[in-house]
Amino acid sequence: MLEKVLIANRGEIALRILRACKELGIKTVAVHSTADRELMHLSLADESVCIGPAPATQSYLQIPAIIAAAEVTGATAIHPGYGFLAENADFAEQIERSGFTFVGPTAEVIRLMGDKVSAKDAMKRAGVPTVPGSDGPLPEDEETALAIAREVGYPVIIKAAGGGGGRGMRVVYDESELIKSAKLTRTEAGAAFGNPMVYLEKFLTNPRHVEVQVLSDGQGNAIHLGDRDCSLQRRHQKVIEEAPAPGIDEKARQEVFARCVQACIEIGYRGAGTFEFLYENGRFYFIEMNTRVQVEHPVSEMVTGVDIVKEMLRIASGEKLSIRQEDVVIRGHALECRINAEDPKTFMPSPGKVKHFHAPGGNGVRVDSHLYSGYSVPPNYDSLVGKVITYGADRDEALARMRNALDELIVDGIKTNTELHKDLVRDAAFCKGGVNIHYLEKKLGMDKH
């Protein structure tokens, strides 16, 4: 087992990783910026090191500072969490070159899956269903590009190969817009991601966002932990997630599970990962793979009983997967509401001092949060301050428990989006299950389609 893990992150995920390390008897090193001296996990870690000023570019994104902190504390491994450097192949490479273990996939695999064109090619080879589109990058030759778009059929979407999280994409509804849109996206992609390559795909008008959680040991063994539905989104940011995804064609589901597991083995994947799909008319279409732990991993843990973060640590220590596919049984239903420090109407960040914090409780309720009474939420980072997760024997029970949990949650002193969640878990269409990715924006009156 790993001896000492440096947690290269902050907030709720840093606390989540620390708890998993402690359960496995692994010593921990917490790193933090000057703005994060009050973080809960700092006092719980064996050691803590300040790695720079408040801006993430000078602290949590500073690779030399993180590696130096690992060296001075004698850490043997580094867990990146999510966000920041979690999917940065250069970070993974420098960690391994410096003699530490990176808790995650190899740099080569991160690069492969981080480039949307090479990722799509790898998935096609593994038999994972993909969205119809350009075979590789969209050619700069105008006639060829127009011919590809005609064959795919409008509307199409032009995406930056190095993009993600909803950035670097443009929907084109007819031929007259194609060339101009391609040029604009190329220019933006070059500036934002350092890679001007773009590709073209069929634009699915009303899909759902369904993803598959996998674990793979990089030694030829891989399993899936079922799927999640993350269709309730605002500006491509997930708001509520659930497992399993409701109302999915079972044959299509089992087929895509098998393909994802096979893909992990073929690319030599190591650690926890997520295959993200658009799901429309009973069919799955691969969009990207996240090569890290995800914010919404708890819903999969609740319905399978598998501790994903502990499994990541075991795999990183060189152990083979201890869980076989036949051991994974999906029982019941789980929901997760992301609690953000933001104005529920304008969605503007709401940093400040938490005067009083009370976490909900009761049967089947889990709260992953770094908040406590007296803690000050800094203005420098993502607004996520916690996740309320509920589990039930079925979806209705999980929803009933979530309604109770949100009513019990108290966060005084700052604004949060709790009221939005209270509304959503009582929304008739969401309660029925199976809303598409545009539903929330339409409900909020911000629909662009």
UniProtKB/Swiss-Prot annotation:
The keyword ATP-binding is annotated on this UniProt entry: yes
Amino-acid positions noted as binding biotin in the UniProt annotation, renumbered to this chain: R338
Cofactor(s) for this UniProt protein: Mg(2+); Mn(2+)
Positions that bind ATP: K116, K159, G165, G166, E201, K202, F203, L204, H209, H236, E276, E288
Co-factor note (free text): Binds 2 magnesium or manganese ions per subunit.
Domain Biotin carboxylation: 1-445
Coiled coil feature spans: none
EC number from the UniProt entry: 6.3.4.14
Subunit structure: Acetyl-CoA carboxylase is a heterohexamer of biotin carboxyl carrier protein, biotin carboxylase and the two subunits of carboxyl transferase in a 2:2 complex.
Protein name: Biotin carboxylase
Taxonomy of the source species: Bacteria, Pseudomonadati, Pseudomonadota, Gammaproteobacteria, Pseudomonadales
